[in-house]
């Protein structure tokens, strides 16, 4: 009996993985030189110029500055596709040290910090580890604008220059109203750019003339193109000008070019071809001036030294592809050459910038190219030129979509396409082997001639070979192969093949063999694996590294934040990473038993991996870890932490607070500590970037084994201690926490442990994993006990649309077991959703087969703690942060009650009046509300979701009763388009950010300014006190109006002020004040001015020279001034107020008058 109880106790003592969240400073510090060009949706822009575009500062100190950007850039997504996504932030950081310049064989190069990773055929590799001969990824395609209306908007914004003259549509003239001085414009139908803007006129024809000429002067006008076809003529002309053009003419012998240019006649331009001895010139008559000016304005065509100064203009990214194709066709018609011997298209230019830009522009047509520097003789000297080559069957076929207008060039293009057999090479030999084994195929079963030479690396496969290989992947005789591999059946050929592939060694299954067997049995392969690789070869190419150069640099470097952690700069895919990547990383490239397992929204680090990484430390500290591992939430920062809530506080069991040891605490660090304190979540501090401490010798492995005088210079140790105390321990002390280096901590329940780490070198990562695992096991054991028989409890991390699945949720299960077919119960803000679980999905393992990262496999059940994707009907209204239960039918009511209680507890108390707040999740809404309440802000309504039209109209009603409530504070959400119009209509202030402390700071600052403005407005409306005396010999008119000279004894006399005598008799109102003959609105103490008084006063009868007059301030105004605005009054104004109050108290016989 006792034995049975023991077994049951052990079952109940099972521990789940602690859930770990990372907060604080998790930036990467991997940056580019200022001049490197980022590929945006509107062309290439230097990264330092992108920084200048970002005006709103998110964070700034002496070492770095982060700005909001919100510009769309090209990136490589997780599906292997080049896409355009938003880059919300741009970074500028101080850097002193080495930079690495990587030059590729296609000519493109880029200079980055040593730790900046490049995508290679062997995964992401840091710049400092890139070697000559490696292959780096470049995009095969890019995108530009295809919206014709947006293109026309760009044209209109560009041509409205100071010198533009236009003729408008005759119908529009009827509605144009001009002053008589400008009526000639209407009569002659000639207008300047400002007239177009002011009267919103439709441009019919254009010309250009300096302002010194009246716009009525006769001009040769050309029609402004309206349609796509009309614009094609302009773009083709521009391309030819970039090739064979000079200032205003074209030197070209090809009749086809002339015939194509004649389409400019439709725009009012006369085109002629003239023979000059042995060559021809094409000249333009009538509209030449307008045409050339248009070329300069729209295409940045240089006025001099054309061949050296041309560059790819922005219009070629904003124009639809059909127009860009005409430009390229014109340029290649003029300067392009089809090399029949080398099977390639060539073009040469003296402008390096143009050729580099052209190679990027060609990617809009999925054409990759190579650039070479060549020397050509010119007037007995050798000059530098740049040659761009287009080679390879795929590129040549894609160029044919652009084509030539010149017959012999088009014929030669067809010839070299026919002769070309191969396209770009893809050095993915290892991946081909992995995929083949994944699909259970032997080498002989792959339908590719001489396949072995590609897999063995003797020859790099071309695009065509890879495509053929992917199309041939299909499992064959898998059941038999499984039996042979298990030893249940014998087949000599298969055994030889398995031995050759490394699945069997000395008659035994290898690790790879066991892995393959497991994959084949579970059918962990599918079409998505092939689709991913197909997508990759359509979207990127690999180019060999020609040279790597190390440069010393002292200055600023720049980087972008993107969701995919990569972007394209100088035509190369570059990457950024965070401390999370280092925490998740294993030190082996292939998957091993017990390797990191990808969950949805999280990464599980098994205890075997932790023990392997922390081996020496565990022995030294005699630690025995019993937890199954750590579940690290993939999304860093407050957003993830606040979104992951459960009843009783945060879902995370323990947190890692990342702080830069060199920079110390930032406002967001303090915010993170406050959130952790509020949620009562234990945390450790990762003191990051110890590798940047002067003199520190940082290396991969445990920090504690590197922290000694043997490995570190005494000065470096001293500097470490100073930074540790000043930047981390002291700020934590000020926030009410004892803290110290983890190896010195005696009682971890009372002192925060600080673990020094480097995300760059990996130093301290074992210490960090060991401390997090050890603390979780020691102090959170009861919390980690797993209810293996109970139903699943969890929280929604994210709601996503998935192709083929519809709306799905990514959830973290923190207790119990989730089973497919059970019922999903979701607690919504105002309701409970009950729906059937259609599928539980987990990502396929990151194994030897290098499966795509975001491909899922269905599972029947999931045990806590785990991240899982749930597919179910009716998930449209579900939001992140909602509590969930997955239960059998008989437990639905109980689960509904639980989630309702949890949602009710999370509801935010609202006030009778206040502002409206919005957030992306329930948890972040709660965190935002708490921070606002600390700042004394009243909240009338708090909701999850984007800012809607209804929200704005509701806030407009709040504003009517109190202007300070006419605001919306929104965290990590969007403003919907229809809401934006209402915001402008009602003048509602919206505060939008994804950093809570910044939102609160901005809002409270606005409140202060608004209160001051309102107070100032109210104060200005009050009648101010003043005492004046009529000067001797200064009565100039006795009445209607009475005019006299006065001295302001104290206070401020203003126009409109009511005046009274010392006995209280009302005299009238100040109509006018003059100071030395000039009208003024007020006169302050000490001033002598003349005043005109409207009213019944008669000077010398009612008041005379030397008499005093008082401004008759109403009692209500006196009370306001005395109680609310005394601090705003000058001393003489206070004197005037107090003397006036004293007088009125006597006159009314009321000592409380005005008080």
From Swiss-Prot:
One GO CC term, this protein: cytoplasm
Lineage, broadest ranks: Archaea, Methanobacteriati, Methanobacteriota, Methanomada group, Methanococci
A molecular-function term among this protein's GO annotations: translation initiation factor activity
InterPro entries (alphabetical): Cro/C1-type_HTH (IPR001387), EFTU-type (IPR029459), Hint_dom_C (IPR003586), Hint_dom_N (IPR003587), Hint_dom_sf (IPR036844), Homing_endonucl (IPR027434), INTEIN (IPR006142), Intein_C (IPR030934)
Family in the record: Belongs to the TRAFAC class translation factor GTPase superfamily. Classic translation factor GTPase family. IF-2 subfamily.
Function field: Function in general translation initiation by promoting the binding of the formylmethionine-tRNA to ribosomes. Seems to function along with eIF-2.
Binding site for GTP: 634-638, 688-691
UniProt keyword terms in alphabetical order: Autocatalytic cleavage, GTP-binding, Initiation factor, Nucleotide-binding, Protein biosynthesis, Protein splicing
Misc note: The intein interrupts the GTP-binding site.
Domain DOD-type homing endonuclease residue range list: 237-367
Keyword Heme: no
Disulphides: none
Domain (tr-type G) ranges: 561-781
PANTHER family: EUKARYOTIC TRANSLATION INITIATION FACTOR 5B (PTHR43381:SF4), TRANSLATION INITIATION FACTOR IF-2-RELATED (PTHR43381)
Source organism of this protein record: Methanocaldococcus jannaschii (strain ATCC 43067 / DSM 2661 / JAL-1 / JCM 10045 / NBRC 100440)
Name this polypeptide is given: Probable translation initiation factor IF-2
SMART domains: HintC, HintN
Superkingdom of origin organism: Archaea
GO terms (BP aspect): intein-mediated protein splicing; translational initiation
SUPFAM superfamilies registered for this protein in UniProt: Hedgehog/intein (Hint) domain, Homing endonucleases, Initiation factor IF2/eIF5b, domain 3, P-loop containing nucleoside triphosphate hydrolases, Translation proteins
Cited PROSITE patterns: G_TR_2, INTEIN_C_TER, INTEIN_ENDONUCLEASE, INTEIN_N_TER
Modification(s) after translation: This protein undergoes a protein self splicing that involves a post-translational excision of the intervening region (intein) followed by peptide ligation.
């Amino acid at each position: 009996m006792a034995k049975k109880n023991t077994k049951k106790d052990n079952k109940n003592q099972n521990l789940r993985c602690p859930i770990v969240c990372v907060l604080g400073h998790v930036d990467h510090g991997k940056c580019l030189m200022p001049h490197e060009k980022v590929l945006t949706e509107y062309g290439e822009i230097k990264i330092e110029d992108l920084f200048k575009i970002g005006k709103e500062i998110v964070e700034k100190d002496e070492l770095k500055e982060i700005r909001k950007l919100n510009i769309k850039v090209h990136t490589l997504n997780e599906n292997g596709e080049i896409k355009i996504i938003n880059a919300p932030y741009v970074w500028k950081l101080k850097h002193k040290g080495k930079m690495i310049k990587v030059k590729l064989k296609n000519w493109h190069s880029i200079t980055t910090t040593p730790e900046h990773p490049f995508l290679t055929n062997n995964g992401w590799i840091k710049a400092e580890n890139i070697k000559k001969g490696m292959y780096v990824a470049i995009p095969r395609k890019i995108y530009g604008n295809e919206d014709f209306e947006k293109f026309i908007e760009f044209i209109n914004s560009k041509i409205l220059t100071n010198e533009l003259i236009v003729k408008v549509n005759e119908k529009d003239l009827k509605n144009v109203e001009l002053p008589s001085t400008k009526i000639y414009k209407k009569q002659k139908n000639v207008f300047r750019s400002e007239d177009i803007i002011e009267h919103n006129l439709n441009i019919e024809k254009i010309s250009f003339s300096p302002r010194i000429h009246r716009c009525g002067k006769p001009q040769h006008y050309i029609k402004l193109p309206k349609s796509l076809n009309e614009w094609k003529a302009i773009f083709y002309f521009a391309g030819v000008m970039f090739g064979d053009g000079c200032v205003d003419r074209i030197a070209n012998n090809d009749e086809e070019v002339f015939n194509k240019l004649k389409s400019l006649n439709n725009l009012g331009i006369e085109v002629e071809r003239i023979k000059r001895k042995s060559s021809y010139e094409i000249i333009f008559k009538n509209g030449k001036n307008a045409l050339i000016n248009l070329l300069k304005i729209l295409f940045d065509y240089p006025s001099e030294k054309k061949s050296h100064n041309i560059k790819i203009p922005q219009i070629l990214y904003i124009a639809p592809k059909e127009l860009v194709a005409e430009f390229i066709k014109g340029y290649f018609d003029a300067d392009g050459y089809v090399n029949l011997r080398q099977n390639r298209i060539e073009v040469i230019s003296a402008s390096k910038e143009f050729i580099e830009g052209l190679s990027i522009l060609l990617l809009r047509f999925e054409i990759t190219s190579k650039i070479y520097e060549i020397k050509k003789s010119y007037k007995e000297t050798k000059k530098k030129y740049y040659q761009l080559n287009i080679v390879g069957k795929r590129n040549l076929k894609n160029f044919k979509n652009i084509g030539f207008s010149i017959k012999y060039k088009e014929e030669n293009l067809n010839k070299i396409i026919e002769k070309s057999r191969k396209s770009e090479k893809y050095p993915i030999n290892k991946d081909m082997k992995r995929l083949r084994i994944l699909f259970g195929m032997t080498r002989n079963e792959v339908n590719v001639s001489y396949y072995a030479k590609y897999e063995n690396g003797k020859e790099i496969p071309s695009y065509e070979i890879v495509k053929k290989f992917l199309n041939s992947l299909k499992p064959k005789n898998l059941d038999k192969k499984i039996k042979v591999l298990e030893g249940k059946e014998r087949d000599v050929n298969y055994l030889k093949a398995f031995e050759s592939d490394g699945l069997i060694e000395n008659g035994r299954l290898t690790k790879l063999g066991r892995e393959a067997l497991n994959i084949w049995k579970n059918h962990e392969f599918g079409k998505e694996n092939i689709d991913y690789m197909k997508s990759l070869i359509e979207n990127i190419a690999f180019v060999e590294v020609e040279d790597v150069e190390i440069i010393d640099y002292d200055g600023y470097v720049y980087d972008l934040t993107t969701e995919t952690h990569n972007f394209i700069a100088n035509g190369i895919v570059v990457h950024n990473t965070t401390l999370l990547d280092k925490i998740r990383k294993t030190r082996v490239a292939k998957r091993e038993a017990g390797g990191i397992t990808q969950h949805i929204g999280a990464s599980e680090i098994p205890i075997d991996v932790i023990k392997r990484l922390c081996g020496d430390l565990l022995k030294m500290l005699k630690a025995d870890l019993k937890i199954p591992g750590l579940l690290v939430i993939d999304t860093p920062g407050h957003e993830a932490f606040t979104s992951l809530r459960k009843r009783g506080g945060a879902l995370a069991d323990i947190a890692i607070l990342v702080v830069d040891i060199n920079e110390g605490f930032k406002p967001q660090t303090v915010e993170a500590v406050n959130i952790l304190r509020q949620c009562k979540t234990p945390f450790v501090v990762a003191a990051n970037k110890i590798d940047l401490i002067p003199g520190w010798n940082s290396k991969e492995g445990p920090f504690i084994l590197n922290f000694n005088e043997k490995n570190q210079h005494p000065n470096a140790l001293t500097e470490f201690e100073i930074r540790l105390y000043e930047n981390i321990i002291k700020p934590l002390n000020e926030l009410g926490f004892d803290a110290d280096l983890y190896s010195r901590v005696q009682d971890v329940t009372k002192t925060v442990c600080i673990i020094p780490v480097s995300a760059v070198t990996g130093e301290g990562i074992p210490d960090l994993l060991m401390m997090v695992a050890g603390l979780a096991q020691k102090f959170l054991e009861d919390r980690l006990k797993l209810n293996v028989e109970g139903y699943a409890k969890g929280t929604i991390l994210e709601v996503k649309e998935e192709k083929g699945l519809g709306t799905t949720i990514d959830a973290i299960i923190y207790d119990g077991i989730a089973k497919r077919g059970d019922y999903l119960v979701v607690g919504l803000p105002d309701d409970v959703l009950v729906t059937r679980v259609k599928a539980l999905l987990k990502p396929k393992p990151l194994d030897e087969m290098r499966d795509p990262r975001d491909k899922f496999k269905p599972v029947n059940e999931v045990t806590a703690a785990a991240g899982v994707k749930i597919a179910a009907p009716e998930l449209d209204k579900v939001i992140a942060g909602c509590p969930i239960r997955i239960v059998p039918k008989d437990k639905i009511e109980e689960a509904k009650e639980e989630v309702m209680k949890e949602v009710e507890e999370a509801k935010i108390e609202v006030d009778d009046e206040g502002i409206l707040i919005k957030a992306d999740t329930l948890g972040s809404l709660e965190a935002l509300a708490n921070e606002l309440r600390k700042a004394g802000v009243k909240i009338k309504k708090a909701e999850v979701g984007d800012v809607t039209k209804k929200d704005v109209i509701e806030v407009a009603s709040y504003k009517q009763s109190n202007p300070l409530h006419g605001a919306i504070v929104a965290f990590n959400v969007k403003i919907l388009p229809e809401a934006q119009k209402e915001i402008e209509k009602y003048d509602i202030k919206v505060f939008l950010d994804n950093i809570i402390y910044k939102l609160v700071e901005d809002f409270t600052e606005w409140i202060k300014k608004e209160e001051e403005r309102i107070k100032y407005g109210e104060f200005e409306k009050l009648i101010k006190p003043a005492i004046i005396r009529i000067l001797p010999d200064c009565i100039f008119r006795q009445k209607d109006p009475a005019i006299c000279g006065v001295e302001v004894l104290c206070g401020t006399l203003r126009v409109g002020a009511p005046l009274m005598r010392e006995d209280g008799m009302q005299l009238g109102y100040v109509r006018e004040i003059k100071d030395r003959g000039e009208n003024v609105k007020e006169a302050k103490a000490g001033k002598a001015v003349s005043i005109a008084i409207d009213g019944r006063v008669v000077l010398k009868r009612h008041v005379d020279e030397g008499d005093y007059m008082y401004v008759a301030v109403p009692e209500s105004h006196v009370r306001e001034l005395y109680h609310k605005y005394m601090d705003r009054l000058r001393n003489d104004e206070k004197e005037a107020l107090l003397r006036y109050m004293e007088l009125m108290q006597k006159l009314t016989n009321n000592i409380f008058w005005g008080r």
